[in-house]
Amino acid sequence: MKTIVLCVLVLAVGASMALAQPCVDAAKEVAPAMSAEAKADLEKKLDEARRTALTVPNGGDADSTIWYGRRTGYTGRYKDTIAIFTKAIARWPQDARLYRHRGHRYITLRCFDDAIKDLEQAAKLAKGRTDEVEPDGMPNARNIPTGTLQSNIWYHLGLAYYLKGDFKRALNAYKECMKVSKNNDMLAATSHWYYMALRRLEKNKDAERLLEPINGDFEVIENADYLKLLRLYRGEVKGEALMSEIGDKAETLGNASLGYGIGNWYLYNGDRDKAMDVFRKITAGNQWASFGYIAAEAELKR
């Protein structure tokens, strides 16, 4: 009898410890698929960022540490990235950038509650301060950064809520993001997720009004896929036409972000079976860290 009681206690303690385990410790981590050449380039840049961060007087500064963390994330070492930013936050707890970047990588690891906590804190710290352009770690074709600290805080916060299925709070974050989206690329990206949140809440009139600025003269530098989706929502292109671009006949889809937007369009237009098929194809692919993949994964779990 004592043996049985002891076993029950051990199992209970083990279950309690499992429940208390931080999300990041239990999270799966999948490295991005890339060529050997691309991997070597990322590792070289990471090594440079690491050496810079470690050789700055007094153990580094926030700027060099941020680059060290970001470049660690580009290689797929997401847990290491979070550890770098966690250590940095202990040194510079008032730096909104650190919470913004750690929040992003919490999203990558599907730790949405942790991401929300960080991004809410980042928003508080950035409130009332002059916005700043956020340099790109992977520059676009024109080498023109399109995001700012505040737009990226609100964008990722909206995404974290969206991925949890909390579309009302996602909507509030995207409203704030629209206020600080000062170029077409950020407007396209924000409008895409904002529109989808509106449709999921059946606010169809508001969703239609949101698309009004996306006219024929609207151009972007790097967010071409989001612009294609906005034109789909406007009725200017067909879902089947966009699907054919990314291999609708294959077992997987070559573009998770575009695929998710199309799948979601099928979903809120009443074709759930087709939507689920698209989501399954996305998650059968290799774009594990992309927002489209994470969103498709979340839909399949709802």
Question: Where do the PLM segments sit?
Answer:
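N-terminal leader/linker segments that initiate helical-solenoid repeat arrays
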Residues: 19-67, 74-75
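Residue-level recognition of tetratricopeptide repeat
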Residues: 70, 104, 159, 196-199, ...
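Short coil turns that delineate tetratricopeptide repeat
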Residues: 57-59, 93, 127, 148, ...
